[in-house]
Amino acid sequence: MIRCENLSIGYHHAGKNIAVQKDLHLEVQAGELIALIGPNGSGKSTLLRSICGLQAPLSGNVFFRDVALNTLSLAEQSRLFSVVLTQDVQIEYSKVHQIVSLGRSPYTDRFGRLERKDRQIIDESLERVGMLSFAQKYISDLSDGEKQRVMIAKALAQDTPVILLDEPASHLDLPNRIILDRLLESLARDMGKAVLYSTHELELALQSSGKIWLMKPGGGGLLQGSPKELLEQGEIQKTFCNEYFSIDKDGKVHIR
């Protein structure tokens, strides 16, 4: 479904290209749940933004079903990728239903008028994340976990085959992290979505994701494999473990 070829990602500074990672070759298939992990500064957010077109790669190409992403209009891209970013929801005076309805923007007219089908998709998306009964509540009245589910409902309402999430659990307590984890599993398994998310929640990622993308620090590349494969190879331990904690071959974190 998604293919990245010779992808180099990074940023521009003082007229120069500063590469964070180079020559990445990656694929994402429908129904896959992929956790993108790595130390701070290894390029996780930059990679997500480069894949979905929010940030141009330094070189290389991203393809969706063999069509280069840079040949598509923004409207076409918005029907392929929905993105949930890290920052808090700051739309204080909007109701949940209004926020989720923004996901229908790629399909509505220039006035944003919702048809019957749009309203049905919005309600189905809210129901999918367990937030339909909150539709008329103000977003400012919700907990962090509830806000995050609203943003995922917005991504679902966008009706794209691919959902990308940047640190979706960053503001959540443990119970809400587990709820989110199960929801992402369901989107991939039951709806056939390709779900790629970055996270620092190592234990949850290793226990629930079918595939891991491990970004090595200092531009050291990206390793791919199942959690079991990368744990048995010791790659995750080499990347993350220090004198304060260790990770065993079952993906359990042990504090020393």
Where in this protein do the model-derived segments appear?
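Helix-to-loop junction immediately C-terminal to a conserved catalytic motif
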Residues: C52
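The feature captures the beta-strand-to-loop junction immediately N-terminal to the Walker
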Residues: I37-P39
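Conserved ABC ATPase signature
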Residues: Y138-L142
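Catalytic Walker B motif of ABC-type/P-loop ATPase nucleotide-binding domains
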Residues: I163-E167
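ABC ATPase nucleotide-binding domains
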Residues: K238-R256
